[in-house]
Structures are given as structure tokens and as C-alpha cells.
Swiss-Prot record:
It is found in: Endoplasmic reticulum membrane. One of its GO terms (molecular function) is heme binding. GO terms for cellular component: endoplasmic reticulum membrane. Its cofactor is heme. Keywords: Endoplasmic reticulum, Heme, Iron, Membrane, Metal-binding, Monooxygenase, NADP, Oxidoreductase, Signal-anchor, Transmembrane, Transmembrane helix. Heme binds at C434. The lineage of its organism: Eukaryota, Viridiplantae, Streptophyta, Embryophyta, Tracheophyta. Its main location: endoplasmic reticulum. Gene3D superfamilies: Cytochrome P450 (1.10.630.10). The chain crosses the membrane at residues 1-21. This is Cytochrome P450 71D94. It is a single-pass type II membrane protein. It comes from Mentha gracilis (Gingermint). InterPro entries: CYP450_71D (IPR052306), Cyt_P450 (IPR001128), Cyt_P450_CS (IPR017972), Cyt_P450_E_grp-I (IPR002401), Cyt_P450_sf (IPR036396).
Length: 494
């Protein structure tokens, strides 16, 4: 719900809410620095201003420190904005911060949190993560999806060639490609309505991002009734159920897909019947995992490609350098596989630098299971934690000239995004690091290499480099505020 509407509703019920706040509010034991807060809304007013929350929370951290207390409505929250604080939460005290906090959007759209992303830290989560890492999205399985990825990239290249010389919505076309890869990897075949499913997922993600009134005032049943988006989310969930139930039933009947082996849904069906599985896998659990794959896989991958192209267009020398590398390494080849990505060292640095500046998960949500301390500050049990990965990736303590796109920095200092370097955590770290990291990365690197290999790019008439620099919007995958439109020209040497 729009923040201005949120303010109006909160003011209308201020008297009622204040009485609840007096009962519910607990002050931390330590005297943490915190911004001035207002009655009823706490620090919500600091998150109004048109910028994504990670930008605004960085401003708070600069003034009040890397472990900052913010009160969002009646909910006590802590924002971590340094590599040291993130390391405490995601390594030193990892089990204590391995929980996710509940929200209206996640509970409705992620099937009562019966998934991997938003599931509580319990036996169900451990089981699903193990299945995901060892069976569903293992490096071996990611390689087996190679022919699907290549076919969808070839479709993308054809679309670009047909549009040569005219502006193309690159963001939209890359998003379709990513969604179709995920769809075919999940269901083992081209689905009749996979385009509709992709659009439905995008719409669902946009609607489910952010906090509802009930999230900010959990003790108020009245505000829950006034959360109109709650009803919209439930309608969207019913639409998603209808589509996914149809696809799953069709899959049960057809069984074998284009793999000739198991696709993601096949594995989940097999595990559902496995008598050795300790915790039964429900139909909602299967649908939740599929929605996970779309939301954290397809959307995050396509968003990263869009950001990479934007940064390269704003830096022509970097564009020339990476295209020269790609065209030399892939000369004469009709397809590209994961093994060949190892040769493209500068292009991989371009991807890393894009992930540093524009992490797919800019704010990483956690929740403390027990009371503890981080950097000397007391954290009560069941405190909501927001780790600002976006801010950490731009911290001048760790990065020289942090707001500048400079892929060469990764040639100078070895840093990876596998959760070992806490100044660079685009996929999180610890036990809850993104389990689909390898799948998502393949869906970024290979399509980006092909787009750089086949085409020269320029801006549409009337656009300047400055038009490409836009802040992201609130959302699970840090999406851009505006789509990227570019004009492709087939590379002359081809």
C-alpha cells in the first residue's frame, strides 16, 4: 500500500493504536543511538522520500552507526550496515539469526511460508534446503539445464535481430527469457501459457513486496481489517493456485518432459512419495518452491542483466573492453556453456561489480531467535533484522571509490560472493545463503555474454547516459524503476 495512504490510515486510528503501543512496546536494554521518532508511526517517516528503503536506511546508518535501532510502526527492528555486523549475524551467531520474520505478503504468496526463502528455521527448512542443494539446483543439474538455457537465449537473440536499428525493451525481453528458462527447468517442457505464468509471477512479486499495516501493527485487528492489499494478495494467490494446480496436474499425467530425465517438479513428486522423508512435502510446499524459483531465480537474474547493460552503456570504455574479450573467446562458436565462462575473466568481473552496486537482495531479512549482542548492542529475542547488503557493498571502508562502476577492482583484490567475504554479500551468507546461486548466476553470465557477443548497442534517440542511472524500486530483487531500452545493431564481423 502506498506510504501516503498508510499515513492517512494510521492517523485515523492513532488514538486506538497509541493505547496498543503503550502495552506492546519494549525498550532495549542498551542505549542505542536512534533517529528521532514520532508517536504512533515511529521512524516510518524516515522511509518516505521516493527512494528505495536501502538508500534511506544507509542515511540512517551514516548518522547513527552500523547497528541502528528503528521502530517501524510498533515493531522494534535493527538495521545492520557494516561487514563486521553482518558477519556477526550471518556467521558468528548464524543459528540465532537463521530465522525469517513473518509478513502478510510472504505468508499469502509463499504458501504460508511453506517454502525455502521465508520458511522458519526448522526441520522442514533443513530438509527442503538439503533437497534443493543436492537434488534440485545442484551444479550438475544446473549444467543439465544448459540446452534449455541455450534455446531460450537463441530465441532472445532472434528477437533482438528482428528489432535491429529500433529501440527494444531489453528488460522485458530478458525477463521473458529468464522466466521461460525457469518454467522449462521446472516443468520439463514448453508450457502453453508460460507467458501468462511469467506475468502473473511478476505481478504477484510487485504486490507482495514491502510491509502491510498488519506487519507494522501486528497487535491491531482493526488495522488488519483496513489492509486492503491483504484482500488483493489473497485474490492473486487464488489466481496463482489455479494456474500452478493446472500445470502440476498436467505434469502428473504427461510425466516425462523434454529432458528425458527428471525436471524440478519430477524430483519434488518423487520426494513427496519417498517414505524416508521425515517431514511430508505438501502440494503447497511444491507450489511454494516453484514460486521461489521464479521470484528469486528468474526475476533476480533478469534484473542483474539489465543493471549490467545499463552500467556498461554509461561506461563505453568498459563496454569495449568486455566485448573485445567475449568476441575473442567465443569467436566461431554457435553456443556457450558454463565451462567457457571461466575464460571470460573480465566479463565475470563485470557481473561481480554489477552485483556489488545492485545486489539482487538489497535488504536481507532475518530474525533473532534468542537475545544476544552485536557489536556491544543488545538484541532482544524475536527482533526483526534487516542487513543492508546494498549499503555494505558501497561502504568506503571496504571499497575504493565505492559508487563508481569499476570491474577492475576484482582483478586487484580477490573477493567472492559465496558468503566468505562479508563486504560482498549479494546472495546473503551463512546457512540461509541463496540455495539457487549457481542456477541464477548461469542465467546471468551466459545470456549477458551472448548479448555482448552478437550486438553493438546504442541509446535510443533523445536519451543520454544520465537517463540510464535510475534508482531501484522496493522489491524482492531490487528491480529498476524504469526498464532499459536500447538499440541493437548486429556486430559487423559476424
Amino acid at each position: 500500500m502506498e506510504l501516503n495512504l498508510l499515513l492517512v490510515i494510521i492517523i485515523l486510528v492513532a488514538t486506538y493504536t497509541v493505547s496498543l503501543l503503550n502495552k506492546q512496546w519494549r525498550k532495549p536494554k542498551s542505549q542505542q543511538k536512534q533517529p528521532p521518532k514520532l508517536p504512533v508511526i515511529g521512524h516510518l517517516h524516515l522511509l518516505w522520500g521516493g527512494l528505495p528503503p536501502q538508500h534511506l536506511l544507509r542515511s540512517i546508518a551514516r548518522e547513527y552507526g552500523p547497528v541502528a535501532h528503528v521502530q517501524l510502526g510498533e515493531v522494534y527492528s535493527v538495521v545492520l550496515s557494516s561487514a563486521e555486523a553482518a558477519k556477526q549475524a550471518m556467521k558468528v551467531l548464524d543459528p540465532n539469526f537463521a530465522d525469517r520474520f513473518d509478513s502478510v505478503g510472504s505468508r499469502i504468496m509463499w504458501y504460508d511460508n511453506d517454502d525455502i526463502i521465508f520458511s522458519p528455521y526448522n526441520d522442514h527448512w533443513h530438509q527442503m534446503r538439503k533437497i534443493c542443494v543436492s537434488e534440485l539446483l545442484s551444479p550438475k543439474n544446473v549444467r543439465s539445464f544448459g540446452f534449455i538455457r541455450q534455446e531460450e537465449i537463441e530465441r532472445l537473440i532472434r528477437v533482438m535481430k528482428q528489432s535491429e536499428g529500433a529501440p527494444v525493451d531489453v528488460t522485458e525481453e530478458v525477463s521473458k527469457m529468464s522466466c521461460f528458462v525457469v518454467c522449462r527447468a521446472a516443468f520439463g517442457s514448453v508450457l502453453k501459457d508460460q507467458g501468462s505464468l511469467a506475468e502473473l509471477v511478476k505481478e504477484s512479486l510487485a504486490m507482495a513486496s514491502g510491509f502491510e499495516l498488519k506487519d507494522l501493527y501486528p497487535s491491531s485487528w482493526l488495522l488488519n481489517l483496513l489492509s486492503f492489499n491483504n484482500y488483493r494478495l489473497k485474490r492473486m494467490r487464488r489466481r496463482l493456485d489455479h494456474v500452478l494446480d493446472g500445470f502440476l496436474e498436467e505434469h502428473r499425467v504427461k510425466k516425462n518432459g523434454e529432458f528425458g530425465g527428471e525436471d524440478i517438479v519430477d524430483v519434488l513428486f518423487r520426494m513427496q512419495k519417498d517414505s524416508n522423508i521425515k517431514i511430508p512435502i505438501t502440494s503447497n510446499g511444491i507450489k511454494g518452491f516453484i514460486f521461489n524459483t521464479f521470484s528469486a531465480g528468474a526475476e533476480a537474474s533478469s534484473t542483474t542483466i539489465s543493471w549490467a547493460l545499463s552500467e556498461l552503456m554509461r561506461n563505453p570504455a568498459k563496454m569495449a573492453k568486455v566485448q573485445a574479450e567475449v568476441r575473442e573467446a567465443l569467436k566461431g562458436k554457435t553456443s556457450v556453456d558454463l565451462s567457457e565462462m571461466q575464460e571470460l575473466k573480465y566479463m565475470r568481473s563485470v557481473v561481480k561489480e554489477t552485483l556489488r552496486l545492485h545486489p539482487p537482495f538489497p535488504l536481507i531479512p532475518r530474525q533473532s531467535r534468542e537475545e544476544c549482542e552485536i557489536n556491544g548492542f543488545y538484541i532482544p529475542a524475536r527482533t526483526r533484522i534487516l542487513i543492508n547488503a546494498w549499503s555494505i557493498g558501497r561502504d568506503p571502508l571496504y571499497w575504493e571509490d565505492p559508487d563508481t562502476f569499476r570491474p577492475e577492482r576484482f582483478d586487484e583484490v580477490s573477493r567472492d560472493f559465496m558468503g566468505n567475504d562479508f563486504e560482498f554479500i549479494p546472495f546473503g551468507a551463512g546457512q540461509r545463503i541463496c540455495p539457487g546461486l549457481h542456477f541464477g548466476l548461469a542465467n546471468v553470465e551466459i545470456p549477458l555474454a551472448q548479448l555482448l557477443y552478437h550486438f553493438d548497442w546504442k541509446l535510443p534517440q533523445g536519451m543520454t547516459d544520465a537517463d540510464l542511472y535510475v534508482a531501484g524500486t522496493p522489491g524482492l530483487s531490487g528491480p529498476r524503476k524504469k526498464n532499459v531500452f536500447l538499440v541493437p545493431t548486429i556486430h559487423k564481423s559476424r
